[in-house]
Curated annotation (Swiss-Prot):
Localization: Mitochondrion outer membrane
Residue ranges of every copy of the FAD-binding FR-type domain listed in the record: 72-177
Residues engaged in binding FAD: 180-215
Swiss-Prot/TrEMBL cofactor(s): FAD
One Pfam match: FAD_binding_6
Family statement: Belongs to the flavoprotein pyridine nucleotide cytochrome reductase family.
Alphabetized UniProt keyword annotations: FAD, Flavoprotein, Membrane, Mitochondrion, Mitochondrion outer membrane, NAD, Oxidoreductase, Transmembrane, Transmembrane helix
Name of the protein in question: NADH-cytochrome b5 reductase 2
Membrane topology: Single-pass membrane protein
Entry EC no(s): 1.6.2.2
Recorded name of the encoding gene: mcr1
Matches recorded under SUPFAM superfamilies: Ferredoxin reductase-like, C-terminal NADP-linked domain, Riboflavin synthase domain-like
Record field: transmembrane: 32-48
Organism: Aspergillus fumigatus (strain ATCC MYA-4609 / CBS 101355 / FGSC A1100 / Af293) (Neosartorya fumigata)
Length: 323
């Protein structure tokens, strides 16, 4: 699948003692004191060496976790920083009370967010996948695109620094282990890139993990491509193992990538064949994309049947995971 002709479909579709033992003793004075001193210093040195060696070999202390799951309940975090990524997308940084703590998330997992609109009877609860590293101490980052009539995304975009939001988790999605699959394919649309990036970053961060990754990422406009800088960095750092294909519904004139929706022809060209061993295809995006590519999930715990383009291409239900 990483042959040159396949990888270029997106165009246009596209790392002392001797002295003290031989000298004659002075009259009336003992010559043993220097020896005792030397032995003491050597003993001290051996002790320090053993202490330092033990310290170097000891595993680092485990950092406290903000989210522990189970019966923990909701955790209130303060918004510390806002970054505008595009006209409709922001990166929001929420800080932990303990600056040494980590989120407690694992790959792949998400968090629930909650707020209660004024005058509403029930709170709004929505899942989000942080884009910050799971081992990052002190804070977590969300990348949030605002959607019309989307109560949580509108609320998040209206927040100011020092305001607070409730979180709960982690919510497990797909348990990843190094080299669990030989080749994975990530089919994403819009903000569906967030769990895909979480997974890809985990793979390439681990020097023992040699998994190949193919990303197919669809968006409306070029400015809608979230995490483009981070994805390009992965491409440049791991050119033999990571390939990304971008498609736009409304591309600019100079655009050299794919145009329009993610099609059967494109996926047939860039994905590994269904008969290949130990592959996995992940799908995440808006409802229309699920319907076209894989069919929808029935519920958070029920993947539903595999339909759409992937079924037509011959992939099995076990080869596909819907975030």
């Amino acid at each position: 699948m990483f042959a040159r002709q396949s990888l270029r479909v997106a165009q246009p579709l596209k790392q002392g003692f001797r002295k003290y033992s031989t000298e004659a003793p002075s009259k009336g004075k003992s010559s043993l004191a220097p020896i005792y001193l030397g032995v003491g210093l050597i003993g001290l040195g051996v002790g320090l060496y053993r202490y330092n060696s033990a310290s170097a070999e000891a595993p680092p202390a485990e950092r406290p976790k903000v989210f522990t799951g189970g019966d923990q309940g909701w955790v209130d975090l303060k918004l510390a920083q806002i970054e505008n990524l595009s006209p409709n997308t922001k990166r929001l940084r929420f800080e932990f009370p303990d600056k040494e703590a980590v989120s407690g998330l694992h790959v792949a997992s998400a968090l629930l967010t909650k707020f209660k609109p004024q005058g509403a009877e029930k709170p709004v609860i929505r899942p989000y996948t942080p884009v910050s590293d799971e081992e990052q101490p002190g804070y977590l980052d969300l990348v949030v695109k605002v959607y019309p009539n989307g109560p949580m995304s509108e609320h998040l975009h209206s927040m100011n620094v020092d305001q607070r939001l409730e979180f709960k988790g982690p919510i497990p999605k797909y348990p990843w282990e190094a080299n669990k699959h030989k080749h994975i394919c990530l089919i994403a649309g819009g903000t569906g890139i967030t769990p895909m990036y979480q997974l890809a970053r985990k793979i390439f961060k681990d020097p023992e993990d040699q998994t190949k990754v193919t990303l197919v990422f669809g968006n409306v406009r070029e400015e809608d491509i979230l995490l483009k800088k981070e994805l390009e960095e992965l491409e440049n750092t791991y050119p033999r193992r990571f390939r990304a294909f971008y498609l736009l519904d409304h591309p600019p004139k100079e655009w050299t990538g794919g145009k329009g929706y993610i099609t059967k022809e494109l996926l047939k060209t860039v994905l590994p064949e269904p008969k290949e061993e130990n592959i996995k295809i992940f799908v995440c995006g808006p409802p229309g994309m699920y319907k076209s590519i894989s069919g929808p999930k029935v519920s958070p715990t029920d993947q539903g049947e595999l339909t759409g383009i992937l079924a037509e291409l011959g992939y099995s239900k076990d080869q596909v995971f819907k975030f």
